[in-house]
Regions:
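Ser/Thr/Asn(+Pro)-rich, low-complexity disordered segments
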Residues: 1-18, 117-125, 242-258
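A cross-kingdom marker for long, charged
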Residues: 159, 164-258
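Structural signal for well-ordered, non-membrane alpha-helices
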Residues: 43, 47-50, 118, 125, ...
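Extended amphipathic alpha-helical interaction segments
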Residues: 82-196
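N-terminal Sec/ER secretory leader and immediately downstream segment
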Residues: 1-84
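Short, low-complexity cationic-aromatic patches
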Residues: 29-39, 78, 110-112, 143-158, ...
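Short, well-ordered, aromatic-rich surface patches in folded extracellular/luminal domains
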Residues: 71-116, 212-236
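Short, charged/polar, low-complexity loop and linker segments
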Residues: 15-27, 98, 130-144, 168, ...
Length: 258
């Protein structure tokens, strides 16, 4: 997912933060906020994987490098950093596929992901609340309002895509009804936040016929996503050790039965 997200940003309109001051993209608000939040989210997710795969104090060099490159440095172009990060992630995936790199326990990884996503939702809700409750609100929204909205939307998109990928990579989760239902709820909640597409971001009172409060709306969806992610993490933590392996063994025996 991380490699695909990086490729989409680089192969699309390009990285807005790298543009010269005269370039039209340098004057945008939503796109730079989206891209910056996406890179930050991927960096934190990669850092989480590095922590889960660490052996003592030894962290996988490729994961460590990717997390550092994705975090960005002010004043430095992101395109070469993103390219190098994608290469590092690809090297790790290649080594892991050949059994040459440490990989995290699947349930532990899924649980850590859910906790991370819940933390994102909580932090974004706080930032959104600060903007919503400003004493003086610009019409229809300030630059900071727009940046806060699209930062939250970008993280929601990353979380939703990661959850979808997690289920595809571990189909045995469908054999655990409570966990499967919790995944459904989390995917739906994050998807609602990620799919908001206002023509113009508005941070108004919401009582007018045309201008809604989009910051409040995405904050509501993030509240549901936070609760769903916490619930998913709790349920994954309650899954008995070896449960997925037992399911695989049962399916093998059933397939071999006459």
């Amino acid at each position: 997912v991380s490699i695909v997200k990086i490729a989409r940003e680089l192969e699309g309109a390009g990285w807005a933060g790298d543009r010269a001051n005269w370039h039209p993209q340098a004057r945008l608000t939503a796109m730079p906020a989206w891209q910056s939040a996406t890179a930050e989210a991927l960096s934190r997710h990669t850092g989480m994987l590095a922590d889960l795969t660490a052996k003592g104090e030894e962290v996988d060099s490729d994961l460590k490098a990717a997390a550092r490159l994705l975090s960005g440095v002010e004043g430095e172009d992101m395109r070469p950093r993103l390219t190098a990060a994608a290469e590092a992630l690809n090297r790790y995936d290649s080594r892991a596929g050949r059994g040459l790199a440490a990989t995290p326990d699947k349930l532990a990884k899924l649980q850590a992901q859910a906790v991370l996503f819940a933390d994102w939702a909580e932090a974004d809700r706080i930032d959104l609340s600060v903007q919503i409750n400003q004493d003086v609100v610009e019409w229809p929204a300030s630059r900071t309002d727009i940046e806060t909205f699209y930062g939250a939307k970008a993280r929601a998109h990353v979380a939703q895509q990661m959850l979808v990928a997690a289920r595809l990579s571990e189909p045995r989760l469908a054999r655990l009804p409570a966990v499967s239902a919790a995944f459904d709820r989390a995917e739906l909640a994050w998807g609602r936040a990620a799919q908001m597409k206002p023509l113009v971001v508005s941070n108004q009172s919401g009582d007018g016929p045309f201008m809604a409060n989009h910051l409040a709306s995405i904050g509501f969806h993030l509240g549901e996503a936070q609760d769903a992610s916490r619930n998913l993490a709790d349920l994954l933590g309650d899954v008995p050790e070896g449960a997925l392996e037992n399911i695989a063994g049962l399916e093998t025996r059933l397939a071999a039965a006459p």
